Amino acid sequence: VYKVIYTDGATGILKIPKGAGKDNLMYEYLAGVKLNQLRHVFPQFIETKHVYYYSDSLGNPPDMNRLHNLTPHNPENGCRTAGHQALLIKEVDGPSLKTKLNDSDFLAHDLAGVLFQIYYTLHMLKHEFTHYDLHSSNILLDNPVGGKPMLFRYTAYDPPIEFVCRYVPKIIDYGRAFVKGIDLSGLESSTCNTPDCEPDGKQCGFTYYHHEFQDVTKANVSQDLRLLVNLPGPWASLSHKVRFGYHVPEKKVRFTTEEHKVGQWPRRIVNVTDALAALTARLPSKKSSYAAIFTINGTPSGDGRRGEYKFVLAQAGGTRRKKRRRTRRV
């Protein structure tokens, strides 16, 4: 990946995968564009900007003048350019979750809030989104207030759930995700059996889309428990309750799991709803000092209500500012 700096000072990340077996960036772009439509409600999704193709090597660092807009945006066109694609997403100026899992202070004070934010989103969108490759390297940690704590208020609960956390987790890499609304009709029967699809149909992404338990054409409410497997230190007791890979062939256990729609919490964690319940019980108590307030109004789509989240700066001491209040998207 490469950092891109625009003439106006804005920044982005250019993803240029290499090697056989890579995911198809056209599909990742299609998934990202759909998820962009949910970012005003669920801030855990990274902003997807553009997908490009190039004819020859881009160089190192890449020459942006060699990139061309990849249109039309469909799987067929994605096949034709599979080995020469680049994806531009918004930059997150923060570490990955993986790099923080050895930090005892993070484990004690922030991990519960980070995981709650992720699994709240996964639970609320359990019929619309499954990541299918959710692990700690695919979570980036953003802080829009310079590393200071923020108060998170989730108003879907009565009374609202409140906790303080220093990070807004951003889910990245949608190349194997199920996202409701993407048209994949004829992907296997037509697109991946055409000469234009080679080598993509065998090496660059589309063949990974239809495993026994991993299918980007449908949701799986258990698949994204992978993130909770083998958590360190004081979180090991929660990981021990996670059932991931149960009744799945050993060689596939690392990547996929059988779906369990009926929850088993508190005895076991078998789906994202169980995970949310377990994480709710681990949230830290509210603190008095925070630099900003996140109000999350996201609710399941079935009830017809989805309010935009709000981000408001706070006064010193953790109270809401009476002046210069502003709401913005992060």
PLM feature segments, named:
Residues 43-108:
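Conserved structural core of kinase catalytic domains
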